């Protein structure tokens, strides 16, 4: 009995010693120049910029999952579109006088050119390898039916011809021509149906997860970069010297450590809002978030996949958010082609696919509850749309698919749950609160912490978004000759607009196409066909947009 007691006592002492050692380790404070919260494409892109701009800065990246690029950046959790407004009709709204506004489309395209240049530069440096593993040429098409929609697309095409960024786009109302471009879309369709399509050969499909993994793998080669997986941020506290102490829990062994950082970037996707609120900076009080998920129908049947090589976007129906437009897309995932159709909106209170059902509730505060209520009251059509989407049956989704693929067979398709997108709700002096489409960099006045909120266009514009962040929080350094020279080496068009400069546009497109292994055909002169005039449109209540 005495031996057993002694043995148990020894075990208890040993376990206590292990516990004390773990606590001692947790109390140790790690120091870093830059803390990147989240292992997605935004953190990876910012880290890559800073590695070139300030190679001596130490960086630490923390990710709560067991690997990087497993949430929104994962190729299966997003549509993989290189958003450049070549086919997305929501970026070219029709004005009340019938004219087409192209300002937003031009801005989106300019932004994607920055991303292409950033990726091409990383390929040349050996940071990104084998471009075909993450970006591939997939033509971008818009496709509509019905007289009003055909008239709209014709006018859109004519309006975009005024921009050097959209040269090379083709337009057709001929069934045979459109069938040649997208056989699945036309086979089995009523030959009398009035249809129209535009096609741009230089469209792209992008695997943002693969880009993220390669960027982070390159960062890991440096001794002053640390990646901590299965690590969740539990607290952020500003210190008297304007550094930050961030408490990070190890989800595998239950220990915690403090990281003292001079600059903190919150690039945690849907979790960014809650962490921004945790920081306590006053700028966070203006924001709330509302989660919307997305589902896609997926086909891997070779008879389907090999018969379709395009991303084909339609036009949102009346009363639906413009960004909700259905599309049938060629994707290249895990090294093989598949076809996706969707998205269909879903609802969950989670802010991340791997998040908590308490995310929405825990992010609601006395500061943002009223803006959220105002958005709900002012956007009944949006609420009605989301409810109708959640109620869709398997048959409803299949009927939606048949509008774009008339000869589709149910057995060729399965349903896939993609990622969560947290929509920005921002306090507004006039309306109380507004739903904001897009992404927004929120930072403190001192430039010591910044977060990226929002969802669209998201990953495809990671490079320009992180440029905006650098200018916002490192303004003095950005204006220095050293940083200016480095940024212009990374992004040759930095500080200039390509739109309107045909020679510069062609030069950058040719350069990035060659480096990234993408198709490039020098476009013909802009179409000089007289611009069609649309009839003035009756003013309709605007439906708030969301990202799926």
Swiss-Prot record:
**From which organism does this entry originate?**
Escherichia coli (strain 55989 / EAEC)
Name the Pfam families for this protein. Mqo
* Gene Ontology biological process terms, A to Z: tricarboxylic acid cycle
* Catalytic function, reaction form: (S)-malate + a quinone = a quinol + oxaloacetate
Broad enzyme group? oxidoreductase
Q: Where is this region: Disordered?
A: 521-548
Bias-annotated ranges (Low complexity): 530-541
Enzyme Commission code(s) on record: 1.1.5.4
> What keywords does the record list, in alphabetical order?
FAD, Flavoprotein, Oxidoreductase, Tricarboxylic acid cycle
Biochemical pathway: Carbohydrate metabolism; tricarboxylic acid cycle; oxaloacetate from (S)-malate (quinone route): step 1/1
Which family is this sequence assigned to?
Belongs to the MQO family.
Q: Which molecular-function annotations from GO does this UniProt entry contain?
A: 2-hydroxyglutarate dehydrogenase activity; L-malate dehydrogenase (quinone) activity
Q: What is this protein called?
A: Probable malate:quinone oxidoreductase
